[in-house]
Regions:
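Catalytic, metal-anchored helix/loop core of enzyme active sites in primary metabolism
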Residues: 133
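Conserved, well-structured core segments that form or line functional sites
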Residues: 129
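Extended, subdomain-level signal for the structured scaffold at the beginning of enzyme domains
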Residues: 1-125, 137-243
Length: 243
């Protein structure tokens, strides 16, 4: 199995003068779900190279065993140093795609034409996709082959209004994920702030927050395996000829 993980290249938190980027747990936790299962992982970002880490995600209160493992993993860090440019990757080379979150994706991946076309290409090929937290915002312009918005009528989740309010960034982000999904006609599913929550609707798998990133990756991997199962046909019945 081959998975493409797409990470933000955006490092400015609106006009606050503070840094943002990807959220470390949302990269590290899915990364090891895939790696420990023997999945081949490719990392990409809009600009390529080393993507920006949201420094807050590496503060002691947000560190986990997996974020610490990632930081000590020379191979993982080497991959992160050399992410591919998003415009250089093709859907045909992968079985699935996963979008870690962080606030950064709301500024770049939500509007990136290569990201939008790539998601559309995966879905058109019948391949499941996984997205967590703020990266659900990267679905806002994705369309179906008939021109209908992907999320219209779809059940999705992502970083909630309540969670955004709790981190004090409601007035900073370019849009609120929950409000945007509802505006676009999605059925927005959520649990209490910071609870694990993963939603599957067809080929689309979404997770609510950082704690949902590992379960979302596991759900995505199961969906890829299920799709790859060979169809078992019944053996033909042999009827004895009679004179």
């Amino acid at each position: 199995m081959k998975v493409l993980m797409i990470i933000t290249s955006h490092d400015q938190l609106g006009n606050t003068g503070r840094k943002t980027g990807f959220w470390l747990e949302e990269l590290a936790a899915p990364y090891y779900v895939f790696k420990d299962a023997g999945v081949e992982i490719t990392l990409a970002s809009p600009k390529g190279g080393r993507p920006p880490l949201d420094p807050k995600s590496n503060e002691p209160e947000f560190r986990t065993d997996l974020t610490l493992r990632f930081e000590k993993d020379a191979a993982a860090e080497a991959q992160l140093d050399k992410t591919l440019r998003l415009d250089s990757v093709k859907q045909e080379d992968f079985d699935t795609v996963f979008y870690p979150g962080g606030h950064g994706p709301m500024w770049d991946l939500a509007e990136d034409k290569h990201s939008i076309k790539l998601i559309e290409s995966f879905l058109a090929a019948g391949k499941p996709i996984g997205i967590v937290c703020h990266s659900t915002g990267a679905l806002r312009h994705v369309k179906m082959p008939d021109g209908k918005l992907l999320v219209e009528g779809k059940e999705v989740t992502g970083f909630t209004n309540g969670e955004e309010e709790e981190v004090g960034l409601t007035k900073v982000v370019p849009f609120l994920v929950e409000d945007e999904m509802l505006k676009l006609g999605a059925v927005f599913s959520k649990k209490a702030n910071w609870e694990v929550h993963v939603v599957s609707d067809g080929l689309l798998i979404t997770g609510q927050n950082p704690h949902s990133s590992s379960p979302a990756a596991k759900t995505l991997m199961a969906a890829v395996k299920q799709k790859a199962k060979p169809v078992r046909l019944r053996s033909p019945q042999h009827v004895k000829a009679t004179n």
